[in-house]
Amino acid sequence: MAHKKGGGSTKNGRDSNPQYLGVKAFGGQEVSAGSIIVRQRGTAFKPGKLVGIGRDHTIFALQSGKVFFRSGRNNKKFVDIIPA
């Protein structure tokens, strides 16, 4: 006879890794070319002047300058870079 009970199984014990999404450079902040400005799922923020968008919808600076957030038509949010 076993002197300890067998270890049961559980349906818990998993957790996903953090995503680290959100705005990384705020309005008025100086950024260099290639800097990530926003990490997002989908296009909550859209690329404006001198800003690119990655495959995973990451918004990044194409040129060095100041970050500028603005609202376009239909309350769409755009991110621009104003060159220094």
Curated annotation (Swiss-Prot):
Pfam families the record matches: Ribosomal_L27
Positions of the UniProt region annotated as Disordered: 1-21
InterPro entries recorded: Ribosomal_bL27, Ribosomal_bL27_CS
GO BP, one annotated term: translation
Keyword set includes RNA-binding: no
A GO MF label: structural constituent of ribosome
Keywords: Ribonucleoprotein, Ribosomal protein
Record-level GO cellular component terms: ribonucleoprotein complex; ribosome
HAMAP family: Ribosomal_bL27
Family: Belongs to the bacterial ribosomal protein bL27 family.
PANTHER family for the chain: LARGE RIBOSOMAL SUBUNIT PROTEIN BL27M, RIBOSOMAL PROTEIN L27
Protein name: Large ribosomal subunit protein bL27
Taxonomic path: Bacteria, Pseudomonadati, Chlorobiota, Chlorobiia, Chlorobiales
